[in-house]
Amino acid sequence: MHTSRRFACQSALALSPDARTLAVVSDRGAGTYEAWTLPATGGRPERAVGVAEHAVRSVCWSASGELVAAADRGGTELDQLYARHPDGPSRPLSVDPAGRVQRLLSWNAASPDGRLVAFSSNARASTDMDVHLVDLASGTERPLLTGAAWHVVGGWSPDGARLLVMRVLENTTQDLLALDARGGEVREVTQRAHDVSHVPAGWLADGRALVITDEGREHLWLGALETATGAWDAIDAPPHDVELAAASANGRAFIWSVNEDGYSRLRWRVDRAATRERALDGGVCEDLVLSADGSRAAFVRLSATEPWQVWTLDTATGEARVALTSSFAVPHEELARPELVRIPAADGAIPCFVYRPRNARGAVPAVLYPHGGPEAQSRPAFGAHLTHLAALVHRGIALVVPNIHGSTGYGRSWQSAIHKDWGGIDLRDLRAVTEWMRQQREFDGARLAVYGGSYGGFATLLCVTHMPDAWRCAVDVFGVANLVTMLENAQPNWRRFLSAWIGDLEKDRAKLVERSPITRIEEVRCPMLILQGENDPRVPKEESDQVVDRLRGLGRRVEYVVYPDEGHGFTNRANADDAYGRIVEFLTRELVGS
């Protein structure tokens, strides 16, 4: 599951009102993320929206022809909104000069008449996200829905009278509201008697909401929800998760993606016709949008053997084509699809993708790569920021990429098992995967490493503190080290979620201390590389500082690099190249030799 799309409804893609032009967020120009436009059938991209010293994160296109973009500075995730008409320059739309306000721009934020854009803002209170409306012509902004909650825009009804809004309570619990766009009635659409996920995907022409939900099921399914009565009609309830969905602005078409053991399958309907589908040939759908009239879809396709690509799909004919592609540093013929392995473990078999170097002779070194989140999923593909992993395989290093408990894509129970159990069920899974790696004759047990970022950094620190003799080296990228200080130092907009995800500072303090890797940091034996963004709003820099200070005090070998203009990830290409280059060189040096 893709967190930014699922819980913020954001997209790095947009289609113009006539479906002829595609907007894409890319760092292809000056080395930072900007909005580019190109013909939907493919062609030369042109810069559309770029903001000095800012990185564009998401876009949407209004019926008036204006392209709206959200951009932040220095990785702070405090997005400002900008707009550009095709005949003019980009201009500020909703901007806080002090840069203290966070905004979320959904892919379907523009009203059907092209006059208004709805977005989330914490201008009133740093802990909450209210729904605001801004007039594209005048720039006039006003709040539409306020309250002590995190609200995310989920789309306008085709007649422009109502807004669908998601109220995020936890990663596995969301409610839906239907708002009168003029500022009147607020209807509670989902009457939550128990924890249920409800992720909006827009409106249908008959006035029902298109929703991804796990109501009554273990896996996420796609349904049509009557907002007045709460009655459901199932559209697609496969034995796998529905991961992404989008309805056209006119409600006459919709498209969705099903996650089948990590691989994606697209399905769509137009004007009540039969469902059509398209497999992505070993690929993964990372982003998905639909034009206002439903005639064309755009999606990002990822693969383990091909570079990042943007595709467009004609929903009438089913014809799909590549509109934009990037490149791999590793030659195409040297890339290979991973094998899906299920590793036995006490709490259930762990799905794991294993990448093996081509033409390997003898036992090879291997890297364990736990993903971030933890409520996310490693897919059988290399995204834009994971191509360096392909470089490791190219250099003769195997990759073992597990989806341990807490991962999405395998049902609600698997995902929610991590709640308030960081350092518990996940550590048991990591032990099982590590032991499996040590038993494989194809891997050199004396040359194993662990590398992860964000929650994956926490998992890395668990591994090196609880299984210190297993690792030749380790890489921690903005990982959580101390569960207590993580909760104490969290930004206000994250605090309401962290107590449900990690634990309560007062009630669970003893367990949090015991489960924190920093408590056992003296157990670390292997050399480490640690990378951190100075402005990280999710995992504060203090987390990495603690680890580095303690390791250096113990005389351990540790390399530490802080990027002053980055946050939770890398939005500047020069920084990304430096960081991923350091990771590849460090792991190659320690596992293979110079």
Predicted regions and their residues:
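Serine-hydrolase catalytic core recognition
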Residues: 289-296, 300-594
